[in-house]
């Protein structure tokens, strides 16, 4: 797959990037080099290779999914000028 000037301009338009006319050619070359590299990656034989999610084997620490207030409500509202029952009090905006 190769990228032409029209495709470079379309990508720039979709990304909302202003590209000067003199920059279209170099960008075309860079995008074609990236696509060539991706095509090389597709040719790599990965038969029998287990997918990795991390470079070191580790298990995720899991906890029970429980709804709670975190036990820190008083710490959260401690710096608020006014509070009531662990809620922030703010001035009325609409009468």
Curated annotation (Swiss-Prot):
InterPro entries: Asp/Glu-ADT_sf_sub_c, GatC. Keywords: ATP-binding, Ligase, Nucleotide-binding, Protein biosynthesis. It is an enzyme of class 6 (ligase). The keyword Protein biosynthesis applies. One of its GO terms (molecular function) is glutaminyl-tRNA synthase (glutamine-hydrolyzing) activity. Its EC number is 6.3.5.-. GO terms for biological process: glutaminyl-tRNAGln biosynthesis via transamidation; regulation of translational fidelity; translation. Coiled coil: none annotated. Gene3D superfamilies: Glu-tRNAGln amidotransferase C subunit, N-terminal domain (1.10.20.60). The keyword Kinase does not apply. It catalyses: L-glutamyl-tRNA(Gln) + L-glutamine + ATP + H2O = L-glutaminyl-tRNA(Gln) + L-glutamate + ADP + phosphate + H(+); L-aspartyl-tRNA(Asn) + L-glutamine + ATP + H2O = L-asparaginyl-tRNA(Asn) + L-glutamate + ADP + phosphate + 2 H(+). Heterotrimer of A, B and C subunits. HAMAP family: GatC. Belongs to the GatC family. Allows the formation of correctly charged Asn-tRNA(Asn) or Gln-tRNA(Gln) through the transamidation of misacylated Asp-tRNA(Asn) or Glu-tRNA(Gln) in organisms which lack either or both of asparaginyl-tRNA or glutaminyl-tRNA synthetases. The reaction takes place in the presence of glutamine and ATP through an activated phospho-Asp-tRNA(Asn) or phospho-Glu-tRNA(Gln). This is Aspartyl/glutamyl-tRNA(Asn/Gln) amidotransferase subunit C. It comes from Methylorubrum populi (strain ATCC BAA-705 / NCIMB 13946 / BJ001) (Methylobacterium populi).
